[in-house]
Design a protein with these regions (language model features):
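Sec-dependent N-terminal signal peptides
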Residues: 4-13
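Sec/Tat signal peptide C-region and signal peptidase I cleavage site
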Residues: 15-19
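Beta-strand-enriched, solvent-exposed domains that form extended recognition/catalytic surfaces
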Residues: 25-160
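Fold-level signature of zinc-dependent metallopeptidase catalytic domains
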Residues: 151-184
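Short non-domain terminal segments
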Residues: 8-9, 20-24, 35
């Protein structure tokens, strides 16, 4: 009985020690990464279009290196110094749906895709991977993000669209804002 308790205690202690702390790797900002997915049903490519910094992060801060859902694509952020995975996100893209159409057999097209990632404190490697329906790698693209890079555009601090809160139930870390937009 003592052995079982000690083994159980060991596993609980080691599981808690692996928990990743958001503040160790990320700032309270958002990195918007814009990509262009291009190609046809025979050949695909991914190109980096633009990097932008937004004023705060409103995404998850726990279980950062785990995939909450499985899609036909993934973004993996690794700490450049250690190679450790510090953030993962899955997605499904319109580009990959389009690849199954008849048009994709005859012509190549490009689709814009934007992803919001937590803003790293240190240089990080970002990898985008697209999968086939059988979960084989279709194409991938890696690039380095250096947080102090002057080519990362700062957005969201000026030219903010006028808005008003009808009800503010708490701070942004605990509540979700709902926007109501008129048609037209």
């Amino acid at each position: 009985m003592k052995q079982i308790c000690s083994i159980l205690l060991f596993f609980l202690a080691s599981a808690g020690s692996y928990a990743q702390n958001f503040a160790d790797y990320f700032q309270n900002k958002t990195l918007r990464v814009d990509y262009i997915f291009t190609g046809n049903n025979k050949q695909q490519a991914i190109y980096l279009d633009e990097l932008s910094q937004l004023p705060s992060w409103a995404g998850r801060e726990h279980h950062l290196s785990e995939l909450p859902l499985e899609g036909n694509g993934q973004i993996i952020v690794k700490d450049l110094a250690t190679g450790q995975c510090i953030y993962k996100h899955s997605f499904s893209s319109l580009f990959q749906e389009w690849l199954s159409t008849d048009e994709a057999k005859e012509t190549a097209r490009g689709f814009e895709n934007s992803f919001l990632l937590p803003y790293p404190k240190q240089p990080a490697e970002v990898e985008v991977v697209l999968f086939t329906p059988r979960k084989e790698v279709m194409t991938s693209f890696k690039h380095i993000v250096r947080p102090e890079d002057i080519l990362i555009h700062k957005r969201g601090t000026t030219h903010v669209t006028p808005h008003r809160y009808m009800l503010r139930s708490g701070n942004e870390k605990e509540c979700i804002d709902v926007a109501i937009l008129a048609e037209g």
